[in-house]
C-alpha cells in the first residue's frame, strides 16, 4: 500500500510541472 501511495505521489510530482509548463508554452505560442 505504501508503494502505491509513493507511485501516485511520484506521478503527480511529474505530471503537475509538465502540465504547467505545457500550458505556459501553449499560451506563449497562442500569444504570438
UniProtKB/Swiss-Prot annotation:
Its main location: membrane. Component of the cytochrome b6-f complex, which mediates electron transfer between photosystem II (PSII) and photosystem I (PSI), cyclic electron flow around PSI, and state transitions. The 4 large subunits of the cytochrome b6-f complex are cytochrome b6, subunit IV (17 kDa polypeptide, PetD), cytochrome f and the Rieske protein, while the 4 small subunits are PetG, PetL, PetM and PetN. The complex functions as a dimer. It is found in: Cellular thylakoid membrane. Disulfide bonds: none annotated. One of its GO terms (biological process) is photosynthesis. It comes from the Bacteria. The gene is petM. It comes from Synechococcus sp. (strain RCC307). This is Cytochrome b6-f complex subunit 7. One of its GO terms (cellular component) is cytochrome b6f complex. The chain crosses the membrane at residues 9-27.
